């Protein structure tokens, strides 16, 4: 509200609260000038380059990609590629966490039902998963909780947690006292952790850097 110029700015828009999209409207356009809202840094969805909020940047465009940026510190749920929505399985999740040490806490609520019932929420045939990331100087803590409807049976979840912008190989990755297997890509600065979560219980993944 305090930036009056943004009322007439139409070169980018929010998709939800954590994606910034800047469509290319002219054929053969090689670059795009984009304003990145302040109070957050932003991450190029395709390259992982971090961009400071409150700045205008000239971004090179690619023919097969729409300029897309993610709010730093956010948790983004995704699924593996599929041919149709019939193949979607809410018990197999990919969670991208765009780690930013300036963002101390962030939260994602993710609704799920079997995709078959009408008015599943009203009938209590649903679950609402809650993922929360907390950061300190040398620790990332990822908490998993689940609110289950009265007539829904929660199942174990296979989760691939991908954490972006991790500057070094962690000292340890644990769920409770159990060590978790992980892979760290020093070039891309990404940490991948695979876990099976009994979603009828709370769980906590602690990463010591």
Regions found by a protein language model. Give the residues of each.
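Solvent-exposed, well-ordered amphipathic alpha-helical segments
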Residues: 137-139, 179, 208-209
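Extracellular/luminal ectodomains and secreted, surface-exposed scaffolds of diverse proteins
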Residues: 176-200
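Catalytic core of carbohydrate-active enzymes
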Residues: 1-139, 145-170
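Short, hydrophobic/aromatic-enriched beta-strand segments in well-ordered soluble domains
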Residues: 142-148, 203-209
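C-terminal accessory domains/tails appended to large, multi-domain proteins
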Residues: 164-168, 191-201, 209
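Short beta-strand element of the conserved SAM-dependent methyltransferase core
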Residues: 69-71, 131, 182, 206-209
């Amino acid at each position: 509200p305090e930036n009056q110029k943004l009322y007439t700015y139409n070169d980018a828009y929010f998709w939800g609260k954590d994606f910034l999209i800047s469509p290319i409207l002219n054929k053969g356009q090689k670059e795009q000038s984009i304003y990145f809202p302040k109070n957050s840094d932003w991450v190029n969805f395709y390259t992982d380059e971090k961009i400071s909020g409150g700045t205008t940047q000239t971004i090179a465009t690619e023919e097969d990609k729409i300029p897309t940026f993610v709010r730093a510190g956010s948790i983004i749920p995704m699924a593996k590629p599929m041919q149709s929505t019939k193949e979607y399985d809410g018990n197999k999740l990919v969670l991208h966490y765009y780690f930013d040490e300036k963002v101390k806490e962030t939260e994602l609520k993710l609704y799920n039902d079997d995709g078959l019932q009408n008015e599943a929420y009203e009938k209590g045939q649903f679950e609402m998963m809650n993922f929360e990331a907390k950061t300190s100087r040398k620790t990332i803590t990822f908490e998993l909780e689940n609110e289950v409807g009265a007539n829904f049976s929660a199942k174990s979840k296979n989760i691939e947690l991908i954490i972006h912008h991790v500057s070094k190989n962690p000292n340890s990755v644990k769920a409770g006292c159990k060590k978790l297997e992980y892979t760290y890509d020093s070039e891309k600065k990404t940490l991948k952790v695979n876990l099976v979560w009994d979603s009828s219980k709370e769980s906590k993944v602690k990463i010591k850097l």
